């Protein structure tokens, strides 16, 4: 019979980092975890920023531009038609699996994500707050009716069959780099109920996070012993605000992130490692 080797032990660096995270919390207290794009790059979803925190590509469309211009919506949905399959086919990675396991072990008070891919829930995490919504849903900006993004994808393909065979580089959040094309004839479906504008049910740049989500995160933070940021540069205020609030409450803030972060001076600990590897080490060492 062939022997099955046990999984390798984490390196001393990963082991020490996992222990350092545990040591920051008072006995019996748990982390509120705030995740960003670095948790999902291992699942094949591109991120927005480089290690210096700078944009890798032009900034995403704003809510004002999307709502104010039919041409902008044509360009958005044409690119999304090609980029959506990457999101639809993405599966949870090492970071998602580790955080779900740590939550089951009682290490995590709650999980908040700035990502819109739904992979934390797919990995088995409970009660995830999707701060910026989910790309798998679409909502009418007129009557509020919702539909699944997969349903809209079928509508887009039916109306624009010539676009299906185009190739494009995947971009963050179901976008695709598709330049040099004439989008003026791209047929964008309207809401089947009221004829209104359909928009992904995610928070665009220039759009506020719904207040009930912010309050839900604050309630979790009140109960948590500290805030752990995983895979986020904190360049967006919607996540950064909770770092400031944790510090104001006298709670430690730690981060697992590769690259420059905003407000690093507020961190009690920063681990410049892949968040999936640190999560795996934490599971292995039962810290």
Name each model feature, range by range.
Residues 1-284:
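Conserved catalytic core of sirtuin-type NAD+-dependent deacylases
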């Amino acid at each position: 019979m062939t022997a099955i080797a046990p999984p390798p032990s984490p390196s001393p660096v990963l082991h020490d980092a996992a222990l350092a995270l545990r040591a920051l919390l008072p006995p019996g207290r748990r982390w509120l975890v705030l995740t960003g794009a670095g948790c999902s790059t291992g699942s094949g979803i591109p991120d927005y920023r480089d290690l210096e925190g700078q944009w890798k590509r032009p900034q995403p469309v704003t809510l004002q531009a999307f709502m104010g211009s039919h041409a902008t919506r044509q360009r958005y949905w044409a690119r999304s038609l090609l980029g959506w399959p990457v999101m639809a086919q993405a599966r949870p990675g090492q970071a998602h699996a580790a955080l779900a396991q740590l939550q089951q072990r009682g290490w995590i008070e709650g999980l908040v994500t700035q990502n819109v891919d739904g992979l934390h829930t797919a990995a088995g995490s409970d009660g995830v707050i999707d701060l910026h919504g989910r790309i798998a849903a679409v909502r009418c900006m007129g009557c509020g009716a919702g539909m699944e993004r997969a349903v809209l994808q079928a509508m887009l393909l039916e109306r624009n069959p010539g676009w299906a065979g185009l190739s494009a580089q995947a971009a963050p959040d179901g976008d695709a780099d598709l330049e040099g094309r004439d989008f003026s004839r791209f047929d964008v479906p309207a809401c089947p109920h009221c004829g209104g504008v359909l928009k992904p049910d995610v928070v665009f740049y220039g759009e506020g996070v719904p207040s009930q989500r912010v309050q839900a995160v604050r309630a979790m933070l009140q109960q948590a012993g500290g805030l752990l940021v995983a895979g986020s540069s904190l360049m967006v205020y919607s996540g950064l605000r909770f770092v400031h609030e944790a510090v104001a409450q006298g709670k430690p803030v730690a981060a697992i992130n590769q690259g420059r972060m905003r407000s690093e001076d507020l961190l009690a600990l920063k681990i410049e490692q892949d968040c999936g590897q640190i999560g795996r080490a934490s599971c292995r060492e039962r810290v």
